[in-house]
Amino acid sequence: MKKLLICTLLLAGAFSAYAQGEKEVKTGWSFGLLPTATFSVDNGFQAGAFGDIYNYGDGTTYPDPLHKISWEASYFTKSHRMRLYLAYDSKYLIPGMRINASVTYVNDPLYSFWGYNGPASIQDYDIWYNRETSPNINYYGMSRKMLRGLANVQGRVTDNLNWAAGVNFWKWTLGDMGGANTPYDKNLTLYRRYQKLGAITEAEAKGGIALELNAGLVFDTRDMEAAPNRGVWAEAYLNGNVLNSPYIKACLYFRHYIDIPIHIPAGDPGFAYRLAWQQTRVGETPFYMIQNVPLLVQRNMISEGFGSSNTIRGLRENRVLAEGLAWANTELRVKLVKFKLFNQYFYIAVNPFFDAGVITKPYRADVLGHTAIDPELVFFKGKNDPLSIAGYRGTIYDDSNIKNLIYSAGAGIKIAMNQNFIVSAEYARCFTDGLNADPWIGIGINYQF
């Protein structure tokens, strides 16, 4: 990714910036394609490709496209995760309505499960890093396969106000760590311990299916969608599962984009913030769905719980699992330079940010109690010799930490083509004790919100 950024900066210097008076207009088809050269502490290096395909027609809707197709095919070297994704989005396919649909398949033979209720689940770095000296132990490991198909539609109520409805189908297959070459002890995992404690029920331990229905309202005054300069984007809706384990979630999202009138050649800087809340109001979410963050319009391939580039940056993936979550994201967006190259319009921007959140409704706290331990962790066999973790008492859960504020800060850099295909690289650090994923690096596409 560094090589990509350096090459882009050199090209920007080699080509003169386009004139201030030149009007940016794209017509016809535009293609964005990049290798998925990313890295994360959870999954390792990612190999594959991703991209977007845009159709701008005669250019009258630019910078918003008439049609957008997104796709990804990738594999992660550390977790052996495989991801396949295909999505379509358009406000113009059916006059007066917006259509959003996608199909996603993910195979995670070494998925990390960190426990419930975020700060209450003690993330023991001795266990995590002792995989170097005791390679048969991966305490936080399990496997999961996910197949998802979704379709959402929006229609006009009044100016800037739309109704929205959708359907999401999920099929989950869960189990012990998979793969023929997996060296880990499948009996010594948090996934197995939670089953013994009753925090994961027998009916859901191997996965299940869900059919979610969404319905609500969307208020949108943004000047553009991919990287708004000004406007408000708010959503209020209900999300409910009608199969197996029924539940209803209430979801509220408010995003505000503010143009800062400091005129620089590349464009005015902007300040953006998001306030979000989701909580289960009726029923209980099954284990295989608890990490999900339901959205009306998917901006990224995966939208899951606290601990990702979609919610609070700086945490491990899906580090905070709860029935109710509230969070805020704030960031400054500053364009450094813009230029024209190969008949495409580019800009480079930076975005320092601050994220924070809290648990508003714990998940199965009554089952786990005030504290939970795993006595098998105090002494366990390494690959060759018995290994004792110095000072470890086997505590895996402490509910006195549930209400701790979760907060992080960091910065990112963006490279945008035609204002829509945006490559993003971000670094963040979480300052809540026991939750920091060091290093946390997120490389993908689009602004977070």
Where does each model-flagged region fall?
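Residues that define the transmembrane beta-barrel architecture of outer-membrane proteins
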Residues: W29-F31, N43-A47, P65-H67, H80-L84, ...
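Transmembrane beta-strand segments that form the barrel wall of outer-membrane beta-barrel proteins
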Residues: S30-F39, D64-T77, G231-V242, R313-N318, ...
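Membrane-embedded beta-strand positions of outer-membrane beta-barrel proteins
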Residues: L33-P35, A49, I69-A73, I99-V103, ...
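Gram-negative/organellar outer-membrane beta-barrel architecture
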Residues: G21-F31, F39-A205, N310, L435-Q448
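C-terminal outer-membrane beta-barrel translocator/porin domains of Gram-negative envelope proteins
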Residues: G216, R222-F342, T360-P362, G369, ...
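Short loop/turn motifs that connect adjacent beta-strands in outer-membrane beta-barrel proteins
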Residues: Q20-S30, G57-L66, Y92-I99, R156-W163, ...
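Predominantly the C-terminal beta-signal and adjacent terminal strand-loop region
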Residues: L275-W277, K414-F449
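Transmembrane beta-strands of outer-membrane beta-barrel pores
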Residues: F39-V41, I53-N55, A73-S79, V103-P109, ...
